Amino acid sequence: MSDINATRLPIWGIGCNPCVGDEVTALITRGEA
């Protein structure tokens, strides 16, 4: 489960760290778009 948690850390990080959330959101947006 450590791998799953590590993969979901960025997702949870969005709510904890706005700065990290912006970077993750940008990557997700580029990936989907």
Swiss-Prot record:
Q: Which residues carry this modification: (3R,4S)-4-hydroxyisoleucine?
A: 11
Q: What does this protein do?
A: Major toxin belonging to the bicyclic octapeptides amatoxins that acts by binding non-competitively to RNA polymerase II and greatly slowing the elongation of transcripts from target promoters.
Question: Which residues does UniProt assign to the signal peptide?
Answer: none
What else the UniProt entry mentions is: The typical symptoms of amatoxin poisoning are gastro-intestinal distress beginning 6-12 hours after ingestion, a remission phase lasting 12-24 hours, and progressive loss of liver function culminating in death within 3-5 days. One of the few effective treatments is liver transplantation.
Q: Is-annotated flag, keyword Disulfide bond? A: no
Protein name, please? Alpha-amanitin proprotein
Domain of life, per UniProt, equals: Eukaryota
| UniProt xrefs under Pfam families | Amanitin
4-hydroxyproline (modified residue): where?
Answer: 18
Q: Tell me which stretches of the chain form a coiled coil.
A: none
(3R,4R)-4,5-dihydroxyisoleucine modification, residue list: 11
Q: Membrane-spanning regions, if any?
A: none
Propeptide regions on this chain? 1-10, 19-33
PTM statement from Swiss-Prot or TrEMBL: Processed by the macrocyclase-peptidase enzyme POPB to yield a toxic cyclic decapeptide. POPB first removes 10 residues from the N-terminus. Conformational trapping of the remaining peptide forces the enzyme to release this intermediate rather than proceed to macrocyclization. The enzyme rebinds the remaining peptide in a different conformation and catalyzes macrocyclization of the N-terminal 8 residues.
Q: Which InterPro entries match?
A: Amanitin/phalloidin (IPR027582)
Which gene name belongs to this protein? AMA
- Give the family this protein belongs to, as stated in its UniProt record: Belongs to the MSDIN fungal toxin family.
Covalent cross-link 2'-cysteinyl-6'-hydroxytryptophan sulfoxide (Trp-Cys), where: 12-16
Keyword Kinase (UniProt): no
For this chain, the site of the Cyclopeptide (Ile-Pro) cross-link is 11-18
GO terms (molecular function) for this protein are: toxin activity
Q: Which UniProt keywords apply?
A: Hydroxylation, Thioether bond, Toxin
